[in-house]
């Protein structure tokens, strides 16, 4: 479910052919599969069937529904944000997910973005959630990890881990690994494999950003300098 599964530009991101990357069409990537095509090829190769829908409707009740969604391509400027809440361009997308969930059909979310965002609503409605980032031209790898072999043996296990912390709230000020108090939603290095058995409690769905009353930008004396400043990476 989701136009993002069929629009290759969404898996490529900004600075792809064009600056923002939004005006690209699938024909601009002649040797690249869309996420939908990669999933369809994988499922059919092991004897299954796939049906596409842009709103969650179906002809035959599915065993599982895969939702593909995320940010539109962006670069600097157009991609700047005032907060970290994910806003789907399809305003009805959450209702599609809620409807499928109410039918007791298992749901998988494949999320496309170039940065961590607050997706608590979507996480609560997902039996499995995979952060794809921007997979580019190699979306066959997505299908490789989310499906097992026909005999249910693992084909390719998940090995990706978060390279930075995933925020718990949009106004979370302390988020860097090693800083205290350190309490992200998903910590630096977090990631699951098929052998993990993890239950994530229902998350807060309040889309509220709290402006701080006061921010200390600088405190102390700037002159004279008593020490040499050395950049450390």
How should each PLM-predicted stretch be described?
Residues 1-233:
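C-terminal non-catalytic regions of proteins with extracellular/luminal or membrane-system context
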């Amino acid at each position: 479910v989701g136009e993002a599964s069929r629009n290759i530009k969404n898996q490529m991101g900004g600075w792809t052919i064009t600056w923002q990357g939004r005006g690209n069409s699938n024909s601009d990537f002649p040797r690249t599969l869309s996420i939908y095509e990669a999933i369809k090829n994988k499922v059919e190769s092991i004897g299954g069937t796939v049906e596409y829908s842009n709103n969650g409707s179906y002809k035959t009740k599915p065993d599982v529904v895969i939702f593909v969604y995320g940010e539109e391509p962006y670069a600097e400027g157009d991609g700047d944000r005032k907060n970290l809440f994910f806003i789907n361009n399809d305003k009805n997308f959450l209702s599609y997910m809620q409807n499928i969930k109410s039918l007791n059909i298992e749901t998988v979310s494949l999320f496309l973005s170039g940065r961590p965002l607050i997706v608590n609503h979507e996480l609560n409605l997902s039996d499995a959630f995979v952060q794809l980032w921007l997979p580019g031209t190699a979306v066959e790898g997505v299908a490789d990890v989310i499906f097992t072999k026909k005999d249910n043996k693992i084909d390719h296990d998940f090995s990706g881990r978060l390279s930075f912390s995933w925020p718990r709230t949009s106004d979370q000020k302390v988020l860097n690994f090693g800083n205290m108090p350190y309490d992200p939603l998903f910590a630096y290095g977090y990631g699951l494999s098929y052998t993990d058995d993890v239950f994530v409690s229902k998350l807060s769905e309040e889309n509220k950003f709290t402006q701080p009353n006061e921010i200390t930008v600088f405190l102390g004396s700037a002159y004279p300098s008593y020490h040499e400043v050395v950049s450390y990476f």
